[in-house]
Amino acid sequence: MQDVVTPAGGVWVHWRDYLTLTKPRVVVLMVFTAIVGMFLASPGQVPWVALTVGSLGIALAAGSAAALNHLADQRIDAIMARTRRRPLPSGHLRPLQVLGFSSLLGVAGLGMLALWINPLTAALTFASLIGYALVYTLYLKRATPQNIVIGGAAGAAPPLLGWTAVTGSVDAHALLLFLIVFVWTPPHFWALAVARLKDYERADVPMLPVVYGERFTRWQILLYTVLLLAVSLLPWATFMGGWLYLAAAVGLGGWYLMLNVRLLLTPGPRLPMRSFRFSIIYLFGLFAALLVDRQLPVWLGA
């Protein structure tokens, strides 16, 4: 059902085009890590306002950044087979519509965080939005094969934002959650870049495999996976998580490591996509284990 009218040109636009702009699957994972950050920052139950308004504000700001990414990348998206059906290159939406939609989400999200959560969370969320939508998308993505390593800081912010939404401050445990997502980001995106290498070459985007080749990138994926496995043990070592979390970190990390060893040894596009997809399961599972390990005694009234 088409239910949004765009006055310019009288073109009917499906509401799903606007939803697509927000990259909802990415935002869901980001907000989930933010919620885990909230629970880990709380000695008992998370304050209701922080959980609801904070999560919504972070989600709206993330959706705004994603829409700006669509706007900045419309030329690249039109070239790449994976993205040419997105709302802008397909002609379903116009740049001004996307800019207006993104601005609305951004103002709403940041306003909610500033008014009902705390200024620190609003400021960090704004910095993350600018870092992803402008610094990464407009500059780093086109300037260096280390784009995702440097720009990954913006995408790693949600668990830190969740923490500050509850406490109003940053501490070492919050930065540790940030570090996990930060180290996870390069192997996640490099696997996709290997699988879609021809697309990135056509679009002239200097992703790591475009500049240094597949073999080098597969090695980097493996090395970062080893680093990620080590970093993922730090919550257990610092008593943020217990034995349940440790079992999940070792199990999920071991499987991810084995998959990326196979990725190094086996040519072809099938394993890069498997690695990319499993990395999402890995991050969700790791943070879910942290949440359950910390909150299970509270939920059981122990």
Curated annotation (Swiss-Prot):
Keywords: Cell inner membrane, Cell membrane, Heme biosynthesis, Membrane, Transferase, Transmembrane, Transmembrane helix
Keyword Transport: no
Pfam families for this protein: UbiA (PF01040)
Family annotation (Gene3D superfamilies): UbiA prenyltransferase
CC per GO annotation: plasma membrane
GO biological process, alphabetically ordered: heme O biosynthetic process
EC number: 2.5.1.141
MF (Gene Ontology): protoheme IX farnesyltransferase activity
Membrane topology: Multi-pass membrane protein
Pathway: Porphyrin-containing compound metabolism; heme O biosynthesis; heme O from protoheme: step 1/1
Catalytic activity: heme b + (2E,6E)-farnesyl diphosphate + H2O = Fe(II)-heme o + diphosphate
Primary localisation category: membrane
Note: Carbon 2 of the heme B porphyrin ring is defined according to the Fischer nomenclature.
Protein name: Protoheme IX farnesyltransferase
Organism of this sequence: Alkalilimnicola ehrlichii (strain ATCC BAA-1101 / DSM 17681 / MLHE-1)
Gene: cyoE
